[in-house]
């Protein structure tokens, strides 16, 4: 069976669409930055995921583009990316800050010249604001002291917010593998297991079934750690009656949806059952609100009202959805100030996190917006039989 992935022609089309937006915005060139931890914007164009070092993509208004990498990644990038213009730029070196005294690297000016961008008083757009470090920004300023440098994250949001059929296929395949891993972990859940042992079960399963990597650090944590909105699994030993939060994710061509559900190792107490059931109801309520044309802020505001009407305002932390794609959580979020309408083929994680002083829980799955609702991109609905208790 053919491997599910993004074809080279689609990557080329992304560069072309970006170049058009660069020109419309009055920019001469766009610089997009990424890292091993958050590669989404740079991989969107290059299909390259850096290791240790950072990377960048430069796209000129004329459609020419280059991948910029650190000194150790030139051959690596040349083998993994479809881009044939790979430039070593010192500002993308690793955090150990090696000097590489024998290396002659290129400057941003050298790279831009290769793209046909000349002159001193140019206008440079920089995207991935939170992934652009001061070394990269200062490198641009040193090369172009007379340039106008502006943030251009709006270009990336415009490009990435609507998913192609190939992107949705990657999300579906990653979710299929994640579902297998979730079932494998539940089959191994019992008192005496550590959280990290369960992570190992999930990792083994996703690689055996075709994932390129974990989509996020696998969540398998119990009891008080379930209060963490984000966390890491530990050496904690799981005990009978513990509520265990699973949030697993496989990665396919970079696309990293997750499936999250709370599982009890044994029988739930009534307190836990009530909160788990409320979270599931809030999750299903959210799913029913999603369709093209609805304002994201309206869903977010009414989501909070749902908690308030149930007397659960103290259990609210955030929600109800965030974008998903090349990273498990990406823009846009659905928040009370998110005044944009939902559009077909926008993809989100319905992320229903409920917290309390002693434990928390999350029901989560990937969906795609349709004209009259949304479609679940996971292979099956979560929580169909209510709160999950694993017999041990």
PLM region spans:
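Active-site neighborhoods and metal-handling regions in enzymes and metal-associated proteins
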Residues: 1-392
């Amino acid at each position: 069976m053919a491997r599910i992935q993004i074809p080279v022609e689609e990557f080329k089309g992304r560069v072309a669409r970006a170049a058009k937006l660069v020109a419309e915005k009055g920019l001469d060139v766009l610089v997009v930055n990424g890292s091993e931890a958050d590669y989404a914007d740079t991989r969107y164009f290059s299909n390259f995921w850096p290791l240790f070092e950072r990377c960048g993509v430069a796209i000129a208004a004329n459609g020419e583009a280059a991948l910029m990498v650190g000194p150790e990644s030139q051959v690596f990038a040349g083998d993994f990316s479809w881009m044939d213009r790979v430039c070593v730029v010192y500002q993308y070196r690793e955090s150990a800050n090696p000097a590489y005294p024998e290396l002659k690297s290129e400057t941003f000016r050298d790279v831009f010249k290769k793209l046909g961008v000349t002159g001193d008083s140019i206008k440079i757009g920089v995207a991935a604001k939170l992934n652009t470090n001061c070394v990269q920004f200062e490198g641009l300023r040193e090369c172009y002291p007379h340039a106008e440098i502006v943030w251009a994250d709006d270009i990336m949001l415009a490009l990435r917010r609507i998913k192609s059929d190939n992107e949705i296929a990657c999300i579906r395949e990653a979710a299929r593998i994640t579902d297998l891993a979730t079932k494998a972990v539940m089959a191994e859940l019992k008192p005496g297991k550590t959280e990290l042992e369960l992570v190992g079960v999930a990792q083994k399963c996703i690689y055996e079934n075709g994932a390129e990597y974990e989509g996020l650090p696998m969540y398998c944590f119990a009891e008080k750690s379930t209060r963490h909105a984000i966390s890491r699994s530990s050496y904690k030993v799981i005990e009978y009656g513990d509520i265990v939060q699973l949030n697993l994710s496989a990665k396919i061509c970079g696309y990293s949806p997750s499936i999250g559900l709370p599982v009890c190792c044994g029988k739930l107490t009534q307190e836990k059952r009530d909160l788990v059931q409320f979270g599931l109801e809030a999750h299903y309520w959210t799913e029913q609100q999603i369709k093209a044309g609805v304002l994201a802020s309206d869903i977010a505001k009414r989501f909070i009202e749902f908690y308030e009407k149930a007397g659960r305002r103290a259990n609210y932390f955030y929600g109800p959805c965030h974008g998903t794609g090349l990273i498990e959580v990406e823009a846009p979020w659905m928040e009370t100030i998110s005044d944009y309408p939902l559009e077909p083929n926008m993809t989100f994680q319905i992320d229903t996190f409920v917290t309390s002083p002693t434990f928390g829980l999350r029901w989560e799955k990937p969906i795609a917006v349709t004209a009259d609702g949304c479609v679940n991109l996971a292979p099956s609905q979560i929580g169909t039989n209510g709160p999950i208790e694993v017999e041990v």
